[in-house]
């Protein structure tokens, strides 16, 4: 969680990083490869649970393993949500090793950290978070060529972030439904391991911004937030938005820092190359079952 402190003491974060420039071509290639997915846009419905499973400790999905949850609800026996309190993977439901896949599962409310992919290169397919706690999915570690994928599924009631990306490489989010949330994706803005360059491709999303029960840490929604000074790049395509009365932006850029607990300064909202790559033709506003192209910043 990013607290509200000044970032201007981090002079090193404002300087160009030669390593990031070197890794940029590798990660850009990974981003291009990741863009081949094409999931359908969600219809806004939530799946019915086929049963329940509670774990006493985090369940590890090994490298190369595919865990099919068969649409049951998974949570923890001894963990309850404590809002935006950070705790680590010991309070998650699932921990995925590189190359692991979690699919067809519902993550219940009795947990704190949802799903962890602590070395990147994992696949999350048709996974649903019924009530997000601190984060739904945390992606860490990896290399510049790492690609982690979130295909289908959905999440709701996130006070802040749904997907937190602290590691390296690319994240792909395709065909995802998010409801009542603060941010769908955040490239970590205050990790001690920064500066790290991160890449994002999001497409075929349905985003319902109406406040239902989330206690948002920021009243204004940023669907994705990237760190411009670290060379982050996001590509957005076919984004369907059901707006609420609060302000929102599809993509915000910030000045990232490596000061834990600081709050990065927002630099811009809306399309801006290369950090926020999209046009308003890529955004479809859904009002009373009618769809219109977005024409201006919100």
PLM ranges: what are they?
Residues 2, 20-22, 113, 134-135, ...:
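Poly-acidic low-complexity segments
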Residues 65-67, 71-72, 77-79, 88-92, ...:
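LRR N-terminal entry segment and analogous cap-like coil->beta motifs
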Residues 31-33, 98, 141:
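Non-catalytic surface loops within mature trypsin-like serine protease
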Residues 1-40:
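Fungal secretory targeting signals
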């Amino acid at each position: 969680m990013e607290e509200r402190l000044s970032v201007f003491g981090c002079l090193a974060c404002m300087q160009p990083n030669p390593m990031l420039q070197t890794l940029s071509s590798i990660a850009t290639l990974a981003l291009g490869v990741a863009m081949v997915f094409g999931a359908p846009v969600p219809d806004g419905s939530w799946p019915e649970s086929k049963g329940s499973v509670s774990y006493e400790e985090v369940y590890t999905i090994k490298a190369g393993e595919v865990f099919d949850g068969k649409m049951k609800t998974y949570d923890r026996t001894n963990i309850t949500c404590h809002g935006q309190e950070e705790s680590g993977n010991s309070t998650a439901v699932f921990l995925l090793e590189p190359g692991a896949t979690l699919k067809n599962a519902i993550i219940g409310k009795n947990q704190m950290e949802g799903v962890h992919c602590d070395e990147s290169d994992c696949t999350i397919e048709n996974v649903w978070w019924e009530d997000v706690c601190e984060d739904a999915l945390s992606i860490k570690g990896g290399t510049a060529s790492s690609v982690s994928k979130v295909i289908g599924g959905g999440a709701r009631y996130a006070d802040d972030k749904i997907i937190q990306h602290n590691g390296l490489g690319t994240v792909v989010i395709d065909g995802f439904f998010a409801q009542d949330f603060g941010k769908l994706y955040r490239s970590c803005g205050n990790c001690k391991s920064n500066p790290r360059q991160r890449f994002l491709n999001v497409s075929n999303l349905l985003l319902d911004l109406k406040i239902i029960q989330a206690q948002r840490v920021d009243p204004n929604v940023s669907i994705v937030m990237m760190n411009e000074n670290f060379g982050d790049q996001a590509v957005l395509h076919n984004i369907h938005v059901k707006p609420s009365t609060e302000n929102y932006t599809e993509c915000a850029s910030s000045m990232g820092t490596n000061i834990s607990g600081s709050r990065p300064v927002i630099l811009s909202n809306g399309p801006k190359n290369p950090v926020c790559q999209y046009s308003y033709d890529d955004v479809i506003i859904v009002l009373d079952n009618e769809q219109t192209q977005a024409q201006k910043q919100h």
